[in-house]
Amino acid sequence: MYEYIKGEYMGINKDYIIIENNGIGYKIFTSGATMSSMPCCGEKIKLYIEQIVREDFIGLYGFESLEELEMFKMLLSINGVGAKAALSLLSISRLNNLKYAIITGDEKHLCRGVGIGKKTAARIILELKDKLKTDELLNCIDEFDDVTQDNSLAVSEALSALISLGYTEKEAEKVLRDVDKSESVENIIKSALVKLMG
């Protein structure tokens, strides 16, 4: 139903961002990669959108690039992979690293995603391996960074947000040790995501 949305970026709230368009604030679920690239509040952005409608839920999922949106749709086509798991896979590493993991059959990497077990990881590899261009292997570098608990409320909220994106508490804590804790929750999350995604 929707192709994209343009509007003012209003901020991050755990696993979604808010974009205001014509006086309406849209709640848009997104990946760590898209979250980490958000501009300052009030600046204009454009996200490519996928709407998911279920009996008990209607949600908008937005991505900075068409390539990431297409990968999201491909992941959703796999039996056993829901929107939360797909976003988690797109949040644990950069898009090219995810493709590299699928092409090379790296089940261990895929199992880092929320709700992704060995069987689901194997299914993702089996069904998507041939759909991804093997020449993309040349552009994919498999690198992994590992997200900190602090007494401050801001860091605690950032930790919760990173875990909801699919990172383990250990990963979240590790990265948050190195961020500037005097920043806002939003900037702490952005800094952590940049570190996590290399």
UniProtKB/Swiss-Prot annotation:
Name of the protein: Holliday junction branch migration complex subunit RuvA
Lineage of origin: Bacteria, Bacillati, Bacillota, Clostridia, Eubacteriales
Region annotation (Domain II) ranges: 65-143
Pfam families per record: HHH_5, RuvA_C, RuvA_N
Chain intervals for the UniProt region annotation (Flexible linker): 144-154
Tagged with keyword Nucleus: no
UniProt note: domains: Has three domains with a flexible linker between the domains II and III and assumes an 'L' shape. Domain III is highly mobile and contacts RuvB.
Domain I: region residues: 1-64
GO molecular function: ATP binding; four-way junction DNA binding; four-way junction helicase activity
Keyword flag DNA repair: yes
UniProt-annotated stretches for the region Domain III: 154-198
Any Gene Ontology CC annotation: Holliday junction resolvase complex
UniProt keywords, alphabetically: Cytoplasm, DNA damage, DNA recombination, DNA repair, DNA-binding
Family named by the database record: Belongs to the RuvA family.
Gene3D superfamilies: 5' to 3' exonuclease, C-terminal subdomain (1.10.150.20), DNA helicase RuvA subunit, C-terminal domain (1.10.8.10), Nucleic acid-binding proteins (2.40.50.140)
Subcellular location: Cytoplasm
Biological role: The RuvA-RuvB-RuvC complex processes Holliday junction (HJ) DNA during genetic recombination and DNA repair, while the RuvA-RuvB complex plays an important role in the rescue of blocked DNA replication forks via replication fork reversal (RFR). RuvA specifically binds to HJ cruciform DNA, conferring on it an open structure. The RuvB hexamer acts as an ATP-dependent pump, pulling dsDNA into and through the RuvAB complex. HJ branch migration allows RuvC to scan DNA until it finds its consensus sequence, where it cleaves and resolves the cruciform DNA.
Swiss-Prot/TrEMBL GO biological process terms: DNA recombination; DNA repair
Subunit structure: Homotetramer. Forms an RuvA(8)-RuvB(12)-Holliday junction (HJ) complex. HJ DNA is sandwiched between 2 RuvA tetramers; dsDNA enters through RuvA and exits via RuvB. An RuvB hexamer assembles on each DNA strand where it exits the tetramer. Each RuvB hexamer is contacted by two RuvA subunits (via domain III) on 2 adjacent RuvB subunits; this complex drives branch migration. In the full resolvosome a probable DNA-RuvA(4)-RuvB(12)-RuvC(2) complex forms which resolves the HJ.
Broad class of where this protein is predominantly found: cytoplasm
